C-alpha cells in the first residue's frame, strides 16, 4: 500500500494462470508520471479582492528516484493585469513551493514548504489604501501509526513560521499598521476509517514559542501587533471531522463538522474561519473568523449524467 502512494506512481494488478496446475500468479504493473498539474478558477474571494481567482499548480514526482515530490503553485486574479500588473489591478497574488521526501520504507515522510502572499482590497475599501503581505514556512514530519486498506492513523509534527505586515498608503507613502511574527509547534493525529461510510477525524494542538517571533514586549514604540491583547505564545486545539456515505447509486450524504478551541487571545493568522466550500459556502471565504469557531454542514449530492 505504501508503494501505491509513491509520488507519481500508479499501480495496477491482475491474476494470471500459474505454471503449475491450479496455480495463480499476481502480476503488478507500475506506471510513473514525472510531471502533473492543473489550472482552476473559482469565485470564492470577496468583492474587495476581485471575486474571481485563478490558480495554477505543477508537481514533479520523484525526479531523482527517491520518492520525493516538488510542488509549486501560483494564484492571482485571472486577468493579464491581475497576473502581471501592479497597484489596484492586483487585488490578490500568492505563490509557493513545497518539497516532501519519504525516509525509509515504513511510511515516515518529511517535508518543507514556503509561501508568500499579497492582498490589496479594492471596492469600497480602495480609498483606505490597504495592503497585507504574508510570508510563511513550515517543516513537517509525519508517520503512519496504522495503515490498512480500510483504516489509517497518521501522526504529524510541524514547526511553522509566519510573518504578516498590514499597511496603508492613504497618506501617499507606505505606513505599517501592524506586524505579526509567529513561530509555532503543532502536533496532530488524523484517522480515516471506511465501513458503511468513510469517516475522517483530524485533531491538532498548536503552541506558539518565542523563537523568531514578535511579542508585545518587542513592539515598544514601533509597529503594533494586529491585536493588542494577542499572544505569540498561544495555545489552541483544532478539530475537523468528515463523514460520507452512499445512500444510493447516485446519491451521497456528506457531513462536515469542526472548529477551534483557543486558550488565549490570538493574532490574525492563528484565528479560525467557518466559511468556505466545505463549511458555510453562502458567505465569502474568510469573512467570518475568530479565536474560537464551530460549524456543522450537511449536504446531499446527487449525480446526474447529462
What residue spans do the PLM features occupy?
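Sequence/structural signature of outer-membrane beta-barrel proteins
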Residues: 44-48, 75-83, 117-125, 148, ...
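Flexible, solvent-exposed coil segments and beta strand-coil junctions
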Residues: 5, 32-39, 66-73, 115-123, ...
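Periplasmic polypeptide-binding modules associated with outer-membrane biogenesis and secretion
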Residues: 1-45, 74-89, 93, 257
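Transmembrane beta-barrel strands of outer-membrane/channel proteins
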Residues: 15, 39-43, 70-76, 112-116, ...
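C-terminal outer-membrane beta-barrel translocator/porin domains of Gram-negative envelope proteins
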Residues: 165-306
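Transmembrane beta-barrel wall of Gram-negative outer-membrane proteins
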Residues: 83-191
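Membrane-embedded beta-strands of outer-membrane beta-barrel proteins
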Residues: 26, 56-58, 97-99, 139-141, ...
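Outer-envelope beta-barrel architecture signal
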Residues: 9, 24, 33-37, 52-54, ...
Amino acid at each position: 500500500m505504501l508503494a501505491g502512494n509513491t509520488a507519481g506512481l500508479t499501480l495496477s494488478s491482475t491474476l494470471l494462470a500459474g505454471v503449475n496446475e491450479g496455480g495463480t500468479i499476481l502480476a503488478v504493473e507500475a506506471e510513473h508520471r514525472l510531471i502533473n498539474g492543473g489550472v482552476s478558477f473559482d469565485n470564492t474571494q470577496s468583492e474587495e479582492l476581485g471575486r474571481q481567482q485563478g490558480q495554477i499548480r505543477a508537481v514533479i514526482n520523484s525526479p531523482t528516484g527517491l520518492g520525493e515530490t516538488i510542488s509549486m503553485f501560483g494564484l492571482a486574479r485571472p486577468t493579464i493585469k491581475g497576473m502581471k500588473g501592479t497597484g489596484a489591478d492586483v487585488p490578490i497574488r500568492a505563490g509557493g513551493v513545497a518539497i516532501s521526501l519519504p525516509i525509509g520504507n515504513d511510511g515516515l515522510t518529511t517535508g518543507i514548504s514556503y509561501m508568500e502572499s499579497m492582498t490589496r482590497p479594492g471596492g469600497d475599501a480602495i480609498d483606505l489604501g490597504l495592503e497585507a503581505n504574508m510570508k510563511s514556512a513550515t517543516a513537517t514530519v509525519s508517520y503512519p501509526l496504522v495503515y490498512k486498506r480500510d483504516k489509517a492513523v497518521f501522526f504529524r509534527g510541524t514547526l511553522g513560521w509566519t510573518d504578516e505586515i498590514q499597511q496603508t498608503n492613504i497618506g501617499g507613502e507606505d505606513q505599517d499598521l501592524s506586524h505579526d511574527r509567529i513561530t509555532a509547534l503543532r502536533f496532530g493525529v488524523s484517522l480515516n476509517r471506511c465501513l458503511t461510510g468513510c469517516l475522517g477525524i483530524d485533531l491538532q494542538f498548536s503552541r506558539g514559542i518565542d523563537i523568531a517571533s514578535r511579542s508585545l514586549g518587542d513592539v515598544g514604540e514601533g509597529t503594533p501587533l494586529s491585536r493588542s491583547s494577542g499572544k505569540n505564545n498561544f495555545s489552541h486545539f483544532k478539530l475537523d471531522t468528515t463523514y460520507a456515505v452512499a445512500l444510493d447509486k447516485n446519491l451521497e450524504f456528506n457531513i462536515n463538522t469542526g472548529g477551534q478551541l483557543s486558550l488565549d487571545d490570538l493574532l490574525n493568522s492563528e484565528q479560525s474561519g467557518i466559511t468556505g466550500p466545505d463549511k458555510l459556502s453562502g458567505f465569502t471565504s474568510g469573512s467570518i473568523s475568530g479565536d474560537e469557531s464551530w460549524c456543522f454542514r450537511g449536504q446531499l449530492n446527487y449525480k446526474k449524467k447529462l
